[in-house]
Amino acid sequence: MSAPDDLLRVSAERLLVAIRDILAEKSIVSPAEIADRIAITEAASPAQGGGIVARAWVDPLFRQRLLGDGTRAVEELGVVMRGAPPLGVVENDGSVHHLVVCTLCSCYPRAVLGYPPFWFKSASYRARAVRDPRGLLAEWGTIVPAGVKLRIVDSTADYRWMVLPRRPEGTDGWDEERLASIVTAGDMIGVTIPKIA
């Protein structure tokens, strides 16, 4: 790291500490609540999202609840959504393929999927997802047939989105753990589709 990068990192850390101190001083949030929220975010990962997808694949009633109210459904599985924007879930099927992007910055369902992949935050991904989504997906090896509608979903500060991908053929009889193991962050963003290894 260069000296300017180090200086920027130190400045950002000082600013974060100052904001936390002010929030605690004004009794807006306690240091324990801040630590709790950080721990929750750090614990979230694409594996957690994969478990949610797997449950929806094997439990039609949960799938229905997940598509109707993503926040409430994932809370059933122990995911803490307190303080997080609402979670919307869109389903890929034979007639529509969804692709999630945050056109303004990097709004992402961190409470469910953890930190966003580096490419999700890039200006290139954000622009191409809107301008040339089929070309972008092709670079990921995802070919959306001409007859399948491609829908771009904008994740925002007010509402976060994830994709419920199609369950791959040949997974009948698989348990939730095995199903969850094949689901990646890309599948829940819509740039890839789950594949059997």
Name what the model sees in each region.
Residues 1-197:
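Terminal, compositionally biased segments used for targeting/anchoring and flexible tails
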